[in-house]
Amino acid sequence: MDTNSTQAEEKIEYVIKADGHKEKRDDSKIQKMADFATEGTNCSSLELQSSLHFSIRDGIKTSFIHAQMRMEAINKISPDQPQWRIVAGRLQTMEDLKRKRKMARTSKQPFDTGADGELNFDKFIHHQITNGHYDAAYFQLKDSHLVELFEMIAAPKKQRNFDYAVESVITLENKFLIGLETPLHLYFVLSLIFAQKYFSTRDQSIYLKKMSGFDNDVLSQAFIDKVQDYFEKASKKQISFPSVILSELRKPNANLSSCFIGKFPDDMDGIMDLVKEFAIISKKGGGIGANLDSIRAFQSWLMGIKGKATGVVPLMKVLNDLMIYVNQSGVKDGAMTTSLSAWHMDVFNFLKTQQLGGEEREKSMDLYLQLVANDEFMRAMERDGDWYLFDPYEILNKFGIDLGKLFGEEFEEAYAFLIEKTKSTSNDPEGFVELYKKVRAKDLFKESLRTSINRGTPYWAFKDNINNVSNMKNAGTIYGLNLCVESFSPFDVDSTHTCTLLSVVHPFINSDEELRDVTRTAIEILDLTVELSTAPTESSRKHNNEIRAVGLGSMGLADWNAANSLSFEMPDHQDAIQARFEKLAYYAVERSNELGEELGNFGKFEESQWKQGEIFGKVLTEIKMESKTDLDWDTLSHKVSKNMRHGYLMAIAPNTTSSSAIGVSSSILPTISKLFIEETKTG
């Protein structure tokens, strides 16, 4: 034994507690904390305790001992010992819980914790409502019922608060947990709200008298089961909510949709209305796509005078500064992609907004550029041919052609017609094109590469393919993509694409039966989210009614692959992954079909390819040819021709923030490093 170390320990007699009073040092408390933090991991409690010896001194604050133990755990994280992340997460959670208990005792309406140190749930709810964190409208159950539900469903699972790695704890605390919440509170409250909405969208009398227990002294078993089902899947991390739901649901007038795409008209009132709409959407937590195809080109006509229009660049500057000013509920920076078609006369100016050099006031460095190309452009590239750029204002007013609305053969015919009109003269009774440019298609592509080298964008949206594979191609045009390129459906000036997201977390879902169960619940929750969400604008509300777009995504695929010894590269492994996602799609369509039969189809169902029995833009023979499973696609195709609740159903989002909160790999992305550090503005 080291006698010097022993003598040093004997000199340390007191520690200072959080309230300032001295207490004799008790090493058993340090041991107990280390034992708890390392329990069930391959990390050593003794190693954690011994690393504190040089940090402890006489008169040290107990809070410092706790913080130092957490830092020691963080310092031990390595590719060979990743479970120190869990140890550090538990220690961080213990600190957070202690801080929140103190907040409860010192709030304007102080309340004590229970005998086990947990917050009294009824007083917790009242505190959250009083302090503006929760909307009281969500908590109409009697206090006794709320406590009964919590004690029955969530309280026995309080250990799940300690199932998060340190990066997940920090993400949850900095971005999503409100007031005195713990992860357990968060998932229970969300589950309660979803369950209440589930029954309120069905028979109201059943909801009030038989199911919810609002008018009874006993909660119905059906209601309890529904809350428990949602809570179990959320708290076991089998489903992952997007940032906007984690941060907004339980607040008044919450927008719960993540993705929006709007189209600018070519008039001042409409332009400024959409700018305001985008500000509201960003404030409410949405990521935005903005299509600029209809904006008249630089030097087009303005009030009848040719050469006076300023084009898309000044509008982009307005949008750029708007995203800096209006963030996403304080959780994220404002985020927008601006899309422009490759035939637009301003396309080169559009690209130069993110190139180095030039006028600073023409730069829009905080936007994400998106170029929209028809197949005709790619053909011009292949043959090293010319490419014509047009002003949308001129061709609409002279020829009645809205070029942005067209795709496929209709676009090709209109485009060829306009090229011929560039060769006409003023004597042509049909008119002629005055404002146009002729460039090499490859020169435009090279210009996009110059911008991409500087900024990483633009990304390309291939318009013909996007619209041709859409199940909604007869219901309107998809002019461009959303910010993260996973969600897009027909939209227009008066109908802003609006989509609600949620992901299944593959590494926590084992069997096919479990995958089906989780997927069905996920689609159910997505549908309830549309009902619960307060659409930020009227055009968003219209799109919800017409298409009812939701996006079921995936998370943690790399972790699931590793757990099942699968590689992204080997063909037979790819078949296994493909089968997994085919099942996911089948179960999602199956549940949406059932909800459509029960609650009604989305507004434009009759105009959609679902009505023809097509699934995700594919006919039955094509689906069966590509199938890697024995699922009954024949029966499902017949069913969807009669009912579908959602016009848009699946969307694999990047979900980097929410995957950090769960503690799994992002989306379907491979893991490229055993250990990495991600820094954000909030930690």
PLM segments and residue spans:
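Extended catalytic cores of very large enzyme megasubunits
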Residues: M1-G683
